[in-house]
Amino acid sequence: MSENELKDDCLFCKIIRGEIPSYTVFENDDVKAFLDISQVTEGHTLLVPKKHLTNIFDYSQADGQRFLQYIPEIAQAIKKSNPAIKGLNIFVNNGEVAGQVVMHSHIHLVPRYSDEDAVSVPHVNNADNYDEARYQRVADSIKDNL
């Protein structure tokens, strides 16, 4: 990626340019992976495209292919780095309403050591609020936009 694809006022663009230090675990022309400063659990890593994309809604198909292909490699390296790791959460917050804080697309890879880690990924079951017609209406609306 070229420097002109980065923004001056973006925290992650500054990290990519080396203006702000990071604990980098992987870097190539497309992505940079570094430890999240918060370390939700030990090894919490961010995978960041070297092209400024605000969130998934800015991705072209080529952006997705170029960036997302590194998830397995980084995830496997995290798992191998510590035998105490039992699992891994991979998540992305897209937009403020979804919890995105830094407006540069990034993927969180959060190692899990036990089911008592301080990580919470809520799962709400709203199936009782859906009948067959509503499921079909939602599915059709998404399908019509592909």
Residue ranges and their predicted role:
Residues M1-L146:
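HIT superfamily nucleotide-processing domains
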